[in-house]
């Protein structure tokens, strides 16, 4: 399956892929460490997005949002906006 994004929910991670979503018990920091920096980047304190998972970008009320290939919206916080822009995702 192609990994598009990971979002944290309490002590779990929701893994977004081309085959749907699944909840796993893991910390976001541990998942990002295993994935490495070449595959994607953190866009928010609770979101990691794969470079190949982004279909589009949009601004909603002045806030940057990445639209995943699934249609799901991944928020981009001000803290991570420079990294998202540098990666060419916005």
Each language-model region and where it sits:
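Basic, polyanion-interacting recognition surfaces, primarily
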Residues: 1-90
